[in-house]
């Protein structure tokens, strides 16, 4: 079976299911598993590299206002591959290519994509939703029994993480300029780690926050998980935000940065790993190599 993934989380779920070698093309943002990174990239972004967070936010807001997709699809490449299955998402126009974009790009009058090509759209907003997406993929490729085994191991891992409880209030920020609250599965991760979500409940959508909002949420600690960025970049974002937090609201609590791509941003079973990292960082009080780092102030 020939599979094209236009979504980093779909590529990760394919790897978790053991079908990474079925992938014939991946998205421009896919960075794991390493065994698929040689595949051609079937998507691109209209957002140029090198922009500040504020500039990225403004570009995204403008595109959303104008009804413009943030992503491009290489229809010529996909038509050449003639895939049996295309993996995408319907959760967030900002995060990745949506099914509507694919339909517009690949199902046009001059398009040669076979009618038999199946488009599977993932929409998980919680751990249970991510599980459902995983089984949606497993059903599409006929590997449900294997998926049951994988999910059993991951479910046990989640249960082990979720066994501890503290009263420590943590605010995770999915963006810092402007600050954005945690959404979808992230508050669920906070609670599973044994912490209290200072702002945002499981299933909530991320929203912009003022410094007054942050102060009113009374966090004991703040985590920087800017969507789409790794640890080093989030350390830089955290260092710049720390000065503002001190100057504007007198916050002197812990601030830690995380590898958002590997722990929080993508709806995959990596969110379970992310809950573990969160627990080790803010409950046990130590950094996780390559995953979390405290901001020195």
Q: Which residues fall in each region the model found?
A:
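N-terminal ligand-binding lobe of clamshell/alpha-beta domains
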Residues: 1-297
